């Protein structure tokens, strides 16, 4: 389903998938542009505070060296001089690997479990860490390009489940993008307010 919609969107709006190299991230400024897109796409979400330049530099240096670039996808608008309009950053889940590390310790052998999860795919879960499309492209179905690129890669690597980041239950647009998948809501967070007199 995503592949059919993606091919239509690609032809109609001239949107295309872009895969990155380490050189593009660190030397050509794509790392910074990714987080600028995240700031723009998440700006209207409840509780989101914009990342500062210092935080962006820290995240680029901390996460991109270990990231599998095959699991990171950008969407470009070729009508707008290859402007980045969407981003999907995913990683193999480290939850089981961290549980196997004795109380989170990386030494003496905890690092091995994390390496296996990151590089050798010894996990069945992929974490969809940061997925966002610019507001003016959401109605055009640009997210279908992300999923049409990423889902076959997940299947090829043997991932069976995807874990998304926090989503508001009232955000119908985000909830509707999962309608074509066998999804299950298994975590729920609540915030309560009490006036102090």
Where are the regions a protein language model picked out?
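Short proline/glycine-enriched turn/loop segments at secondary-structure junctions
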Residues: 117-119, 179-184
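Conserved acetyl-CoA-binding loop-helix of GNAT-fold acetyltransferases
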Residues: 125, 129-133, 138-154, 180
């Amino acid at each position: 389903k995503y592949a059919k919609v993606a091919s239509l969107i690609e032809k109609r709006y001239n949107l295309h998938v872009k895969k990155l190299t380490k050189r593009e991230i660190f030397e050509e400024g794509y790392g910074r542009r990714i987080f600028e897109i995240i700031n723009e796409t998440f700006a209207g979400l409840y509780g989101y505070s914009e990342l500062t330049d210092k935080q962006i530099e820290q995240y680029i240096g901390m996460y991109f060296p270990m990231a599998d670039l095959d699991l990171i996808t950008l969407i470009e608008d070729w009508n707008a001089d290859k402007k980045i309009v969407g981003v999907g950053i995913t990683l193999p889940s480290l939850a089981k690997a961290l549980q196997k590390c004795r109380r989170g310790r990386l030494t003496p052998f905890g690092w091995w479990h994390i390496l296996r999860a990151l590089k050798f795919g010894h996990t069945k879960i992929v974490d969809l860490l940061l997925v966002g499309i610019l507001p003016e492209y959401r109605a055009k179905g640009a997210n279908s390009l992300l999923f049409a690129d990423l889902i076959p890669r997940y299947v090829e690597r043997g991932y069976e489940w995807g874990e998304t980041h926090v989503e508001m239950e009232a955000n119908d647009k985000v909830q509707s993008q999962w309608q074509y998948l066998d999804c299950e809501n298994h975590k729920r967070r609540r915030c309560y307010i009490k006036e102090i007199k």
